[in-house]
Amino acid sequence: MIEFAKTNDKNELSSLWQMTFLEDSKVIEYFFNNVLKDVVTPVIKIDGEIASSLFLLPCKIGEYKGMCVYCAMTKYSHRGKGYMKELLDFSYNYCLEKGFDFLFLVPAEESLFDYYEKCGFNEFGISRRIILDATIPENKERLNYQYKIDFDSSIIDYWKNCCVVYGGEITDFGLVSRDDETVIRNAKGDFIEIPQDYKKEKTIIQGDISFGEEYTPAMIRTENKELLELDCYIGITLE
């Protein structure tokens, strides 16, 4: 039976998260202390213990409201029993009941695309982008043809914290670099870590044209066909 996690489920959820994703304990602790209050956490319990769970993060795509599936996880001993599909169906129906338009996720690995398709999701291409200054005309033009997938501030702060834990840097502009996904500019205007593909275009980058784009195949479940046609990006706009 599906229920919503309670405060006393924190330790069990934390252990399942670490076991499933080998996540740093600092990241998990930050999430539970600063983000959990803003998310919905459906769980399936078997014999009083959590067998499967996921987090639902509120988000928006333009005027459309929805939820993002995060940390979908099932104990090894309970995999293959259909629990995650039950949770995903429950989550989608929950979205509809609350008046939301979609349920969104980014599969952790390529092998999961077929699985999520069977659960009613469609592939939904997005790009990861960092816009250094949205007030500059060229950047505004770049933003006009795409919809930003936006999250609550507590969730954004959590992802910033993740980058710090895994070796990124926070600047006064508020965003970080992690691996080659993003680039940042510090408070003095100096660039920190420019991806190889963009090094030849440093003059363009210094002109504040948006950059740091990377196509990410995501998936979305929705009754709204217009959403399937949107060109979207996920990232932070530094204004």
Specify the residue positions occupied by each region the protein language model found.
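Amide-forming acyltransferase catalytic core, primarily the GNAT-like/NAT-type
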Residues: 96, 119-197
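Conserved GNAT acetyl-CoA-binding A-motif
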Residues: 95-108, 202-206
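Short coil/turn motifs at secondary-structure junctions
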Residues: 59-61, 77, 110-112
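A conserved beta-strand-loop-helix scaffold within acyl/acetyltransferase catalytic domains
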Residues: 4, 10-73, 159-199
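Conserved acetyl-CoA-binding loop-helix of GNAT-fold acetyltransferases
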Residues: 74, 80-93
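Conserved active-site alpha-helix within GNAT-family acetyltransferase domains
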Residues: 101-102, 108-127, 212-220
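Extended terminal accessory/targeting regions
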Residues: 192, 200-213
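C-terminal functional modules
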Residues: 207-239
